[in-house]
Every structure is written in C-alpha cells, then in structure tokens.
C-alpha cells in the first residue's frame, strides 16, 4: 500500500472510531428529535424568506464548520446556522465544496433533481441514514460552473455522485424546505493558492445569486479527541488554533492563513489532515476583496473542536 493510500485508509479508520465515539455520547432518546422541534418553526419561517434578486448585488461567499449527525441534536447550533441563512436572501442556487470529496479531478455531483445523499459516517441511529434532502434540478448551475472553467481544465460530471454529509447536513438545516438547487464541486487539491484560483473562477456566480460555500471544520483533530472533550472540555491546541485563525481572518491576512502549517499554534493536532481547513480558500478566493476582514457568523466549540464559520463579500 503506497503512503498516500495508507494515510487515507488510516484516516478513514480514525473517522470511523470518532463517529462511534460521538454516537456513544450523543445518544438522544429520540434521534434527531431536536431537528424535528426545529422544523416546527423553521419551515414556516423559510417559506417567508425573500429570494435573491440582482438588486441585492453579489451574495457573500461563506465557510462553515459542518458537523455530522450530532448537529441534528444540537438546537443552539441549528439555530445559529438557520439564523445565518435567514440573514441573507434565499440564493438561486448553492455551490458547495466539502472536505469529504477530495483527491478527485475537478468534478460536479449529480445535477438531477432529488440528488442522492452519501451517508459517509458510521455508528449512529438508523434515523440519520433515512434522512433525505430532495433538492430541485441543478443542471443550469452545472452548465454555468463548467462555463467559468478554462478549456485546459474541464469539469467532469459525476452523474452518480450524491451530496456527502459535509454538504447535506448543514444545508438541511439552513434551507430545510429543500427548494434551492444544490451542486457539489470536488476539491482537487489542498494547495491554498490553487484553491484561491478556483474560488476566483467561481466569483462571477455570486453576482448571479449563487451561494458559494467552503465546508469544513475550523479545528478537526479527531485522532486526539478525548472523553473529556466529548463532554465539553476544549484542549489548548484547539483554542490556540481558533484564536490564531480568528485574528488572521479579522485582519484579512490570507498569506498568514495559507501558512498554517508553519505559523499556526496547535498544529498538527488541530489538523492532522488538512481537508477540513483548506475549503476556506475556496471561500476567500471567491471574495471580491479577500484581503478585507471576514465576518465571523458562528463561534464556539462542539466536542472540543472549533465550529468557527465566516462570510466574506
């Protein structure tokens, strides 16, 4: 087994163990019961949300910490995500780049209506594997994304690829009606400069009412999660990395953010693998002025991991 494949295998094993540990602690009497309660008011509110028009100007690009099935049992976090979405006009479509579709050629998920979901987690109650998110056809967005890519870098259409949990879990909370077309774009590299370039190509879509999302987690040291963290403790490595990122984002210091391997405290514990951090460079690249301060929309911790999320204009 080559080194890259072995790392991917070991990472998948860590994720599986971490999901099982989460499931053992986040074990509500009614799985996703908090989500059901959330829907009792969120659906009506969503129906009143105003849809984006050209007069609104470009939508922001956003980076969100996406969570996993326990998000559906975390009422405060759902309220934060939903409140964020409601503070913006309803997008005409969503294009999302998730930490969980990496090391792939530049590709788009299935664009047909009722896109299937990828249940890329293990050890949770059956309810989470029965959830659906039946979004409208995103074919028009797929064609538009392809049109902004250079001829030398074609976009592949992966007609059988559904939305992974880095996409559908937060979006099911943010847009619970499922009435916004959603398309997922793969993350073909971890290189910040290349991801910034990819984000720049997506920038025109924001002016057309498309919400561009980078989906990851501000700290994601799953191999180092302890029983104490599952019960609310926050380790120094997570706090320190989060404070460093918050400061750099507040200054619009993209160069510092891109130098996280050497400059960020709390490394490599906060990101032993970097796929949950680097989607932010899609977000920053899609910004009109990446060097402007970002606006933090969500902060705090889940399982000791920073769920900091932000938007840029």
Name each region found by the language model.
Residues 68-69, 101, 189, 217-222:
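Short, glycine/serine-rich, charged loops/turns that create anion-binding
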Residues 141-195:
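Internal, conserved structured core segments that host functional sites
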């Amino acid at each position: 087994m080559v080194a890259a494949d072995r790392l991917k295998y070991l990472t998948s094993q860590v994720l599986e163990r971490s999901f099982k540990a989460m499931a053992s602690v986040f074990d509500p009497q009614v799985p996703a019961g908090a989500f059901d309660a959330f829907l009792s008011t969120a659906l009506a509110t969503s129906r009143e949300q105003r849809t984006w028009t050209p007069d609104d100007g470009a939508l922001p690009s956003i980076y969100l910490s996406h969570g996993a099935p326990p998000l559906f049992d975390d009422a405060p976090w759902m309220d934060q995500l939903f409140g964020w979405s409601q503070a913006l006009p309803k997008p005409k479509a969503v294009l999302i780049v998730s930490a969980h579709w990496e090391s792939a050629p530049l590709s788009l998920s299935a664009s047909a209506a009722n896109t299937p979901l990828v249940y890329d987690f293990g050890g949770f109650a059956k309810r989470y594997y029965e959830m659906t998110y039946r979004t409208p056809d995103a074919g028009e967005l797929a064609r538009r994304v392809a049109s902004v890519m250079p001829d030398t870098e074609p976009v592949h259409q992966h007609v059988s690829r559904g939305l992974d949990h880095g996409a559908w879990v937060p979006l099911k909370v943010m847009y619970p009606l499922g009435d916004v077309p959603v398309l997922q774009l793969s993350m073909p590299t971890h290189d910040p400069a290349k991801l910034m370039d990819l984000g720049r190509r997506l920038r025109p879509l924001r002016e057309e009412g498309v919400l561009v999302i980078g989906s990851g987690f501000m700290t994601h040291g799953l191999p180092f999660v302890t029983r104490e963290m599952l019960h609310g403790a926050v380790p120094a490595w997570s706090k320190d990395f989060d404070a460093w990122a918050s400061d750099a984002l507040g200054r619009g210091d993209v160069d510092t953010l891109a130098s996280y391997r050497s400059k960020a405290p709390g490394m490599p514990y906060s990101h032993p693998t970097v796929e949950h951090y680097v989607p932010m460079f899609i977000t920053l690249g899609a910004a009109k002025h990446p060097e402007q301060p970002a606006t933090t929309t969500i902060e705090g911790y889940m399982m000791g991991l920073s769920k900091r999320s932000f938007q840029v204009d």
